[in-house]
């Protein structure tokens, strides 16, 4: 039995979880998320808890059991508290500013880079070199932050670029002078 999958998921007050076949819908104060679970796995709501079960001990069922339980738990956390991912912009002249429904970056290119917020995602900017990606879908928040970081990854010599808040960038020594 999966150690993660067998744990029941507590449903907090103000959150409604409904299971319709293979579709799980989670509604809460911050919004609504839906999830389609893989075929052999079953989910059911009992006594304010969500129980995830699997029919057999085949390899595929075992691997999907804990995954499904974690995805449902992430959706419950998302609609109650939400998810955030902080980004820092490091470098001389590198900056970020809110513009329309997205953010505009100056990252040393010959042109500014504009990133529009996907549906369900919002950006907050603190100063000119810190920003936060906010949303209820953990996967979408992480993917959006990764796409922004990908525009200008931190380089190893000076550390310039977009990095996650608190990320350690491995630094290299430069060329040794004569």
Curated annotation (Swiss-Prot):
The keyword Ribosomal protein applies. One of its GO terms (biological process) is cytoplasmic translation. It comes from the Bacteria. SUPFAM superfamilies: Ribosomal protein L6. InterPro entries: Ribosomal_uL6-like (IPR000702), Ribosomal_uL6-like_a/b-dom_sf (IPR036789), Ribosomal_uL6_a/b-dom (IPR020040), Ribosomal_uL6_bac-type (IPR019906), Ribosomal_uL6_CS (IPR002358). Gene3D superfamilies: Ribosomal protein L6, alpha-beta domain. One of its GO terms (molecular function) is structural constituent of ribosome. GO terms for cellular component: cytosolic large ribosomal subunit. Keywords: Ribonucleoprotein, Ribosomal protein, RNA-binding, rRNA-binding. Belongs to the universal ribosomal protein uL6 family. Part of the 50S ribosomal subunit. This protein binds to the 23S rRNA, and is important in its secondary structure. It is located near the subunit interface in the base of the L7/L12 stalk, and near the tRNA binding site of the peptidyltransferase center. This is Large ribosomal subunit protein uL6. It comes from Clavibacter sepedonicus (Clavibacter michiganensis subsp. sepedonicus).
């Amino acid at each position: 039995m999966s150690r993660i999958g067998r744990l029941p998921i507590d449903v907090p007050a103000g959150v409604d979880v409904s299971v319709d076949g293979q579709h799980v819908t989670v509604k809460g104060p911050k919004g609504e998320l839906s999830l389609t679970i893989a075929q052999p796995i079953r989910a059911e709501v009992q006594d304010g808890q969500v129980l995830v079960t699997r029919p057999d001990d085949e390899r595929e069922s075992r691997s999907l059991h804990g995954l499904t339980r974690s995805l449902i738990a992430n959706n419950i956390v998302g609609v109650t508290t939400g998810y955030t991912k902080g980004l820092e912009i490091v470098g001389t002249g590198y900056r970020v500013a809110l513009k329309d429904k997205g953010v505009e970056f100056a990252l040393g290119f010959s042109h500014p880079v504009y990133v529009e917020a996907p549906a369900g995602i919002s950006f907050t900017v603190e100063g000119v070199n810190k920003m936060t990606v906010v949303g209820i879908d953990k996967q979408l928040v992480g993917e959006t932050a990764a796409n922004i970081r990908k525009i200008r990854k931190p380089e190893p010599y000076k550390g310039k670029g977009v990095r996650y808040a608190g990320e350690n960038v491995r630094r290299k020594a430069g060329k040794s002078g004569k």
